Amino acid sequence: MSLFDFFKNKGSAATATDRLKLILAKERTLNLPYMEEMRKEIIAVIQKYTKSSDIHFKTLDSNQSVETIEVEIILPR
């Protein structure tokens, strides 16, 4: 589902499905209260060893039991 999918005309079933997916994705992140603390700790460790402040987290894939997060680190030359 991309950002542009929200602006297309589609049926009510497809709209309801998209809304449900967004709600479920949000609820999954709410069920993991340690996730934000873990991100802060990862940033602290990366900054300690690389002196980089350009760190980005991306959630790639989520299902009922696994959430995959990608960390992008821009290293200075």
Curated annotation (Swiss-Prot):
GO biological process, one term: regulation of division septum assembly
InterPro entries: MinE (IPR005527), MinE_sf (IPR036707)
Keywords: Cell cycle, Cell division
Provenance organism: Helicobacter pylori (strain ATCC 700392 / 26695)
Protein family per UniProt: Belongs to the MinE family.
Name of the molecule in the record: Cell division topological specificity factor
The protein's role, per its UniProt record: Prevents the cell division inhibition by proteins MinC and MinD at internal division sites while permitting inhibition at polar sites. This ensures cell division at the proper site by restricting the formation of a division septum at the midpoint of the long axis of the cell.
Top-level taxon: Bacteria
